[in-house]
């Protein structure tokens, strides 16, 4: 729950029961069984209190015979969707950084290098690499349902005719898939240039991998005018405010390296701000790093 009047809180989750050997019944009255207990695991989270503003001059509207304020209003939803997608990706990068630093990289399969020379097939996206990443979840791998990748990686798979399109339930949209995983193509996915090569990071997502919520905002949107702006021509400013949470389940956001009230994109990607609290198999995320 979110702390009252604050932007931090905790998510409580009961741990799996495990598979201890059962008791075996007998006819001895004094031989009593000992009950097991279920433990609770807590994850800390931090909301992002965000805002953005856009201004338009009255004269520009009068000369163009168009309504820029209306155009802005119609695009605000897309702006926040894109912004929150970037925050989600940066959170995943922070989770990966923590995993490599503190959990032996047991969620990552990497074949990427920064070697000089041509990229080899073994260093590119391929079925073997994806399946090895899937295997980091062991017998829980069936939870994985989607893979997010940069458009460069998606195009390489297209060139090999490995993207299979499946119609949605209504038959109106063809959904791209690879190895049965729904493909999410996004150029916000990391493409980090080294001295010789680019390393691309892909993410396998499972159902329930990300928790999402919205906090209370006193004034989600507002407008104000400055009649003196433009030498008296007038200016209108539109303000939009949100309080959002996108949190990878199985990790606590420690806020160890957060300077302000909300974590920036750069702070979300820091290993120091994340700590895994669930067993690896219970976290439906896996990471892949390739050169092409």
Predicted regions mapped to residue ranges:
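Glycine-rich loops and low-complexity Gly/Arg-rich segments
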Residues: 34-39, 70-72, 78-81, 170-175, ...
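Long, contiguous amphipathic alpha-helices that act as assembly "spine/axial" helices in icosahedral shell
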Residues: 11, 39-103, 139-148, 183, ...
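Assembly/oligomerization interface modules of large self-assembling protein complexes
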Residues: 1-50
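Generic structural "secondary-structure junction" signal
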Residues: 4, 47-49, 56, 61, ...
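Short, low-complexity, charged/polar segments at coil/turn and helix-coil boundaries
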Residues: 1-7, 13-20, 121-155, 179, ...
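Sequence/fold signature of self-assembling virion shell proteins
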Residues: 115-128, 132, 152, 158-292
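Short, low-complexity, polar/charged sequence segments that are solvent-exposed and flexible
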Residues: 29-33, 64, 72-75, 165-168, ...
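Alpha-helical scaffold segments that mediate packing/assembly in large oligomeric complexes
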Residues: 59-137, 267-269, 274-281, 287, ...
């Amino acid at each position: 729950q979110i702390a009252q009047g604050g932007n931090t809180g905790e998510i409580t989750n009961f741990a799996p029961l495990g598979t201890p050997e059962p008791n075996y019944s007998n006819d001895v009255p004094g031989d009593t069984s000992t009950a097991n207990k279920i433990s609770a695991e807590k994850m800390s989270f931090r909301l992002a209190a965000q805002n953005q503003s856009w201004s338009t001059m009255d004269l520009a509207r009068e000369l163009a015979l168009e309504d820029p304020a209306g155009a802005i209003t119609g695009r605000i939803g897309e702006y926040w969707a894109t912004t929150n997608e970037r925050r989600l990706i940066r959170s995943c990068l922070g989770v990966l950084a923590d995993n490599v630093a503190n959990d032996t990289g047991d969620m990552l399969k990497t074949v990427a290098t920064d070697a000089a020379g041509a990229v080899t097939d073994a260093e590119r996206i391929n079925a073997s690499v994806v399946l090895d990443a899937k295997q980091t979840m062991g017998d829980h791998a069936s939870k994985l349902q989607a893979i997010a990748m940069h458009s460069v990686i998606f195009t390489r798979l297209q060139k090999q005719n490995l993207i299979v399109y499946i119609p949605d339930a209504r038959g109106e949209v063809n959904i791209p898939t690879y190895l049965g995983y729904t493909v999410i193509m996004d150029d916000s996915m990391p493409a980090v240039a080294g001295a010789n090569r680019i390393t691309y990071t892909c993410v396998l997502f499972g159902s329930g991998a990300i928790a999402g919520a919205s906090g209370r905002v006193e004034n989600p949107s507002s407008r104000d005018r400055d009649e003196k702006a433009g030498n008296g021509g007038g200016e209108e400013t539109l303000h939009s405010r949100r309080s959002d949470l996108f949190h990878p389940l199985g990790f606590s956001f420690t806020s160890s390296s957060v300077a302000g009230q909300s974590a920036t994109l750069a702070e979300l990607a820091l290993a120091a701000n994340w700590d895994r609290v669930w067993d690896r198999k219970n976290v439906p995320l896996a990471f892949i790093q390739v050169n092409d």
